[in-house]
Amino acid sequence: MASSSNTMEFEEDDSTVTQTSLPTTTSVLDKSRSLFGNSAVISTPARDSTPDGHIVDSSVITKSSVIIEAEDEPDVAADVTALDKEKAEDEPQCSAGKDAKSGESMNDSEKSESPIEEGEGETFEKKIISMDTSDDKLDIAESISVSNDTEKPEENEEKVVGDEDEEDIDDVQEDDEDEAPKKKTKKAVSTSDDDDLHEDDSPKGGSVSDEKEEPENEDDTEEPENEVEVESPVKEQADSGEPIENVNDDKASEPGVGEISQDSVDDSQKIGLDSKSPDGESEANEENQESQSSSRSTRRAKRVSATVSSTPSSNTPRRGGRGQKSEVNADETKTPIVSNSTPRRGRSSRGGDRDEVIDPTENVVGDSGVEETSPRKGRSRRSVATEDTSVTEEVENTEHPTEEETPKQGRGRRSAASSSATSSAVPTPRSTRGRGRKSQANEENLQEKETEDPTKTHDTNQAKSTRTPRGRRSNADAETMESVEAEKVETPTSSRRSTRAKPPAKSAPVTPAVTNKRTTVRGRKKQGSITEDPIEEADETIEETLPQKKGRGAAKSAPSSSKKSAEYDPYDLDTEMEHHPEPLKNIHMEVHNFGAVKYAKLGNSESKYSMTEKAAESRIAELQSSPAAKNRRSLADMTPGKDKMKHRVSSVGTSGRRSRAKKEEEHHENDIEMEDAPATATPASSNRGRKRKSEASDIKTPPAKKEPVIPLKNLSDEDQLLVDHPQDDNEPHAPGARVYAVFQKMFYPAVVLSERDGLGRYKVQFTVDNVIKDVPNSGIIPLRALSPGKTAVYNESDVRLDSGPNDISAAEWKKGKLTISIMDEDGEPTDEVKVVDWYDVSFDHSEWRDYVKSKDQSATAIVTSNITTISEATRARKPTTVSNQAKPKGRKKKGVDLVSSRGGSASPAEEEEKLLPMNEEAIGKNIFTGKVFMLTSANRSNSASVPSMFKKKNLMNFITQNGGIVTEQLNSFQERYSNYEPLLISDTYYRTHKYLAALARGVPCVNNTWLQACGEQGKCVDYTDYVLPAGASIFDESQDMPAPKNPSELLKGTTIYVHSTHSAREVTQTGPGGTFIEIWKPILELLGADVVDGDWETLDETGLKFDVVLVDGTFRDEVMEYADTIGASRVTSEWVIQTIILGKAPEPNAHPKFDPYRLHHRTRH
C-alpha cells in the first residue's frame, strides 16, 4: 500500500501535467475509468450484451460497452479520465509497460475520436515523465519502471509496426531490441508512433482500454527481474506492430478489453484487494495500474500475467469479458505458457500462411489472458512468425479498433513465450518440435518440478478458475492450445496453473521463478541447455502419454506432471537402459599378482574352460604339422581392433556365436576396460588381447614363411653358365644356380632363390613340388659337382652317372643333360644308357657323405678366407719357444706310455682326448726344433667331425711343447725364420690363401697325421710320404695333382697387370685381409711373373704394356678394350690357381672359368 500511495503521488504530478496537455484524453480516460472503476459492473453487462458465451465475444462486448459509454456519457468519461490519468501516471512509475499500453489505448481511442489522438500523444509524454520519475520509487516500483521503459519503446515500436508491413516485424523487433538500452530514443520514437496511431479511430478505443487494463494486470509487487527480462519480448511486440494492429481491428480490441478487465480484476484482487478504495474509481485506478503492469508483462513476458491468475471467485464475473484477461495476467506472474501460448501457437500452427500476428480473435475469444500468455511463443522468431500469420487471418475478420491491442498481445506473446521458455526447464527445440502434446507434457513436468510445493496448495483453487478458460480454449481452438503449449515447452504447467486462477497473493511469489526463467528465455540456447539435460529422458518417456492430457483441463496436466516426476528414476534400468552401463551379467573377475584385477566376459558356453579350449584349438590350427591349419582360425583373428584373417571356420555354429559376440561388443561398449573372452573366439579384452596379439603374430609366422610359388628364373645360356660356374668353387651360391638340396636323407633337384642369410643358409625351391626351404651350405650339391661313377635314382630305380652336363659350351650346359647307365639287380651297370634331364635325377645322402664332410671342413673362398698380405697381418702371433725343463715325474705314475706334452690340472683322460700321443721316451727331446709351422684355418676347433687331438689349438700346443714354432704370417718363412725349415700342416688340400701361397713358395704341405707319427715314434720322421697334393685339376677333377717342384719358374717371363676397382678389404679370422691386388700380386711374383702397376684410367696415355691382365668381377670395359688393342690375354684368378695346381700355365682360353665375362659376380658398369 505504501508503494501504491507513492505511485499515486507521482501519478498525481504526472496527471497534472497530462491534464493540462490532454483535454480530449480526459473524456477517453473517463470512459476507460468508468470501465475500470466499475470493473465488475462493466464486465457483467459486457457478458450480458454478448450473446456468445465465448470469451472472445465477452471481451468484444466489453470493448463495445466501453466505446458506447464513451459516446453516451462524455461527462462521466471525463471524470473517469482524470482519475485514469492519475492512475496511469502511477502505473508508469510502477511499470513502464503500463504507460505504453495506456498510450496504445489512447491511440485506439483517437482512432475512434480525433481529440483522443492528442491525448494519446500526451500520454507518451506522461510515459516519459514516469520513466524519469521511476528512480524515486521503491525497489518494486523501480523494477516495474524498468519494465515500463522497455514497454514504452515497445509500444512505440508496435505503433510503427502498425504502419509497416507484417514482413518488417522481425526486422523492427531486432532493431528495437538493439535500441532497448536507449530509452530516450525509444521514447521519442514511441511518441511519433503514437501520433501516427492517433489517426486510426476504431482500434484506438479498444487499445486504450487494453492498455489501461494491461498495466493493471501487471502487479506492482511482481519481481523486477521478470519485468526486466520481459524487455526483449516487448521489443518483439513492437516489431510485430502492424500485423498486430490488424489483429486488433478484428479481435484484438475485444480480447484486449476483456483482458484488461480481467487483468484489472485480478490485479485488484492481488494488490487492489488490499488497496481498494470504497470508490470504484480507486479500484479502477489500481486495476488500471495492474493492467498496465500486466500488459507490460504480457508484452515482455506474458508468463507473469498468466501466473498471476486471480482467484476464481472474484474474477468469475469478469471472466466473461475482462476476467479472462485478468486470469492471463495472473498466469503471467507464474507461467502463462500453456494457456496463452497454446492458443497463439495453435493458431500460428494452423494458420501458417497467415501474417506475423497470432490469432488474437479466437485466442482472445477463447481466453484473452491465454492470448497474452501465448506470446511466450515469441521465444523464437519462428513462433513469432507463426503468431503473425495467425494474426493476419484474424485481422481480416477483426475490426480496426482492436488493432493496437493485438500487436501488444502479439509482442506480449513473444515476450511471454520467451519468459515461459526461460521459466520452463524443458529444452526449447523439443517443445517447438513437439508443438503440441509433447511440449505440454514437458511443460507440465517442469512446472511441477519448479513449483511442486506452492503450486500444490493452489492447484485446487486454480483448477476451478482455470477450467473455465481451459474449456474456452478448447472450444476456441484446441489445436492452437496444443501447439502453443508445445512451443512453450518449459512453462506449460505454470501457465495452466495460472489459467486455473491461483490467488494473486500466491502468484506474486511464483513470478520470481518465472522471471528468472524469462531471463533465460532471452537466451533460448541457455534455456534449452538448462532444461534439456535433466528432462530429455522424461520427455521421451512421457511423449506418448502427453497427447491424452493436452486436450483436457489443466487439472490433469499438473497431477500428470507430478506423477511422471515421481515415476522418473534416472537409475531405472527399464527406462534408462540406453544411458546405463551394461548389466554385470556373465562378468568374471580374476585377481592376479600385485593386486591386479581383471574382468572377463564369459561366453555362452557353460564350460569353465571354454576359453582355454578355444585358444588351444586356434593355436593347434596354426602349427605346420597340423593338417587342419587352413580350416582353423588364428588368435590374430580373435584380437579386437585388427583386421581379421579370412579363415573360414568349418563349424557353422561357431561362426554364428562369433558373429553374435561381435555384435555384443559393438553394442555394449563401456568406459570400463573389461576383458572379453567368450567362447566365440572374439575376445574384447585389452590386456590379454595384446598378449594374444603378440602370440598370434608368432604363431602365424610359419604359414607366413611359406613363400609363394616363384617361377624358375629363365636365364640366358651365358648367364646360366656364369651362375653355375662361379669363379671359385668355395664362393657362395648365386641365385638361379642349379643344385641338389637335401631333404630327408635325399638330394633333390632345386634352384637357389636368394643369397646366403646370416646363418649361412640358402633359400631353395625344389623343382618337383615348388616347395621352398632353407638349406645349409653342407646340404647343397651344385650341378657342377656331379662326378662320374656316382649312384643316382631315376624313376625309383638306381642308375649310375656316367657324365654331367658339358660346360665347354654355354648352350650345352644350359640344357643340363646327364648320361646315365641302368643298373641290374646286382647293382652292376648294364649296357643300357640314357640321356636325361638334370631335374629327373636324385641322389642318396650316403653317396655324398664324403663331399658333405669336406664341405663342413672346407674354408671359404680365397677372396674371403684367411687371405692376408705380408704387410697387413698385424695380428700375427709371435712364435713361442718350448722350455727345455723336464716335465714333472708325477705324470708317469699311471704307467701310460702316452703322456700329455702339456702340464696342467686336467685329468689324464681329458689329456688323451685333446692332445696327440707322445712317446714317453721322446718327452723333452724337442723333436721339432729348427722347424716353423703354419696351420691352415681348415683345422677349426669348432668342427665336430675333427678329432680333438687334431684341432688347431691342440696341434699348436703339441708343436710348441716339442720345440716347434707356430706362425700365422706368410712372410715369416723367409724374413723372420729364414734359417728354419717351413712346413704347412693341414688335413687335406685347400684353395685358401695360405695353402696357395705355400705352394707358390715351394713350402711342403704336410698332412697332420705326420705330427701324430712323430709323437708315436718320438722323433721327427720323414714327411715325404705325408705331403699333400696341390689340388684337383679343372680339366680332370678325378685326378689330384702333386705340388709343383719349381713354382718360381711357372710364370717366369710373363708380364701381368692386376686390375680391380674393388678397394674394400676382406675380414678374416686373423684380422683385416687384403684387396684383390694385394692378395694376388705377391703370389704372381713368387711364381716368377713380372707385375706392373698402373692406373687403369691412364693406360692409353701411358701406353703400358703387359701380356696378361688379371681381373675380378669389378673390371672396367676400358681395360678390356685396351688389353685387346695390345693383344694381352684376359684371365681370372682361376687361371693362376690352375697354374699352381697343374705346375704349368694353361692357355688363357682353355676353360670358360678363365673368361672374365663369365664371372657370376661381375659388376656391370
Swiss-Prot record:
Q: Where is the composition biased (Acidic residues)?
A: 163-179, 211-230, 280-289, 533-543
Q: For the region Disordered, what residue ranges are annotated?
A: 1-26, 70-578, 608-713, 874-913
Query: Which Gene3D superfamilies does the UniProt record give?
Result: BRCT domain
Sequence ranges assigned to domain BRCT in this UniProt record: 923-1028
Its keywords, alphabetically, are: DNA damage, DNA repair, Nucleus
| Keyword Protease set for record | no
Q: Name one GO molecular function term.
A: histone binding
TM segments? none
**Polar residues bias locations:** 306-317
Can you quote a single GO CC term? nucleus
Record's subcellular location: Nucleus
The annotated regions of Low complexity compositional bias extend over 16-26, 415-431, 554-563
Q: Write out the biased-composition intervals (Basic and acidic residues).
A: 98-114, 123-140, 149-162, 397-408, 446-461, 662-671, 694-708
Name of the protein this chain belongs to: Protein hsr-9
Annotated organism of origin = Caenorhabditis elegans
Supply the gene name: hsr-9
